[in-house]
């Protein structure tokens, strides 16, 4: 295979396919999720405590450092980068990083995308498209403005709708993500699905995950998606399809709407056997698994020298520790999360 090496930032990027990182179980790691901030302008009850303590800003990597880290991963075979948070679009000057990552598309990287709550989309949609972002995920758990305010604690539903409108107008494809919550939005799922499919958007429903101490009781929130699917099949014809986006969702086609519906089931049917991702936090911590605590400190290697050899070695060592699967359980006895850190730190 012929390759040509170019340089973006401090890391070398291969303009042809780099050899992918392979974990101990033979899985290629080609997907990097980057939590650019732990801060969010919402406080969704299943994700955060109301009075969260956030990381001191001095502890965060600079956007230039995040760019350098991402470049190193692209040089090591990562094809897709997703920016997450917290809420990624509340990070000051975040579009600098988006633009830098967009410049890597076609130079080793296939796609830059992000997951957002939609609150800042109306301001950034056109620039996101200009930077090379072609599809995003928007988290939306209800279409009822009052319920939306309750679940987010103070979110503005109208602002999110404006953001979705702006993104679609800019040419960005949207997939809606909805966390399935018992006795909150389970009865509303048909309406959410019709809304999404009516606007040309896929909908993915997600089981709540036991991460971080929150004010709510997760045993009260938890809804197995097997039950949700059974309920939906009383009204709709769902046919399993072989459609993949590089993530863990298993998709069906809904005959009555013509749209796609995805199920992400970390609790009832985990997706670990095909896991292709690692997660980088805004402090330079690399988590090899969403549901495990083992992590690698890449910040030390990043700041030790301007040469990337030490950083590449640290990444290689971390990949050798990627586990076979997660340890998610809903602890009904002690009501403790399976993982102490909040989703907003890891980025989902």
UniProtKB/Swiss-Prot annotation:
Catalytic activity: GTP + AH2 + S-adenosyl-L-methionine = (8S)-3',8-cyclo-7,8-dihydroguanosine 5'-triphosphate + 5'-deoxyadenosine + L-methionine + A + H(+)
Keywords from the named record: 4Fe-4S, GTP-binding, Iron, Iron-sulfur, Lyase, Metal-binding, Molybdenum cofactor biosynthesis, Nucleotide-binding, S-adenosyl-L-methionine
Positions of the Radical SAM core domain: 24-242
Annotated positions binding GTP: 33, 82, 115, 175, 277-279
Cofactor: [4Fe-4S] cluster
Sites where the protein binds S-adenosyl-L-methionine: 46, 86, 139, 209
EC number: 4.1.99.22
UniProt-listed InterPro entries: Aldolase_TIM, Elp3/MiaA/NifB-like_rSAM, MoaA, MoaA_NifB_PqqE_Fe-S-bd_CS, MoaA_twitch, MoCo_biosynth_MoaA/MoaC, rSAM
Binding-site residues for [4Fe-4S] cluster 2, renumbered to this chain: 272, 275, 289
Name of the protein in question: GTP 3',8-cyclase
Gene designation: moaA
């Amino acid at each position: 295979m012929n390759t040509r090496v170019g340089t973006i930032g401090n890391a070398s990027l291969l303009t042809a396919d780099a050899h992918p990182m392979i974990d101990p179980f033979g899985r290629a790691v080609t997907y990097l999720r980057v939590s650019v901030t732990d801060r969010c302008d919402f406080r969704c009850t299943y994700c955060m405590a109301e009075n969260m303590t956030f990381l001191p800003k001095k502890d965060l990597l600079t956007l230039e450092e995040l760019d350098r880290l991402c470049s190193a991963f692209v040089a090591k075979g990562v094809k897709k980068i997703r920016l997450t948070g917290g809420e990624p679009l509340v990070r000051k000057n975040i579009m600098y990083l988006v633009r830098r990552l967009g410049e890597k598309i076609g130079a080793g990287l296939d796609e830059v995308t992000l997951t957002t709550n939609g609150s800042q989309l109306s301001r950034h949609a056109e620039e996101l498209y200009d930077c090379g972002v072609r599809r995003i995920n928007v988290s939306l758990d209800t279409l009822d403005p009052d319920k939306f305010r309750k679940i987010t604690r103070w979110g503005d539903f109208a602002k999110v709708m404006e953001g979705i409108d702006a993104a679609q107008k800019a040419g960005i494809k949207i997939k809606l993500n909805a966390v399935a919550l018992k006795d909150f939005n389970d009865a509303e799922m048909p309406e959410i699905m019709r809304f999404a499919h009516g606007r040309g958007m896929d909908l993915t429903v997600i089981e709540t995950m036991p991460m971080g101490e929150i004010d709510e009781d997760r045993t009260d929130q938890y809804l197995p998606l097997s039950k949700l699917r059974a309920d939906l099949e009383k009204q709709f014809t769902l046919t399993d399809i072989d459609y993949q986006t590089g993530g863990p969702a298993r998709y069906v086609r809904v005959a009555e709407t013509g749209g796609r519906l995805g199920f992400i089931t970390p609790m009832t049917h985990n997706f670990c056997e095909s896991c292709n991702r690692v997660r980088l936090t805004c402090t330079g911590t690399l988590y090899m698994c969403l549901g495990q605590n083992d992590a690698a400190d890449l910040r030390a290697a990043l700041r030790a020298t301007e040469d990337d050899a030490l950083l590449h070695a640290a990444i290689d060592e971390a990949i050798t520790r990627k586990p076979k699967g997660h340890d998610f359980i809903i602890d009904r006895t002690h009501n403790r999360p399976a993982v102490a850190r909040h989703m907003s730190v890891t980025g989902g």
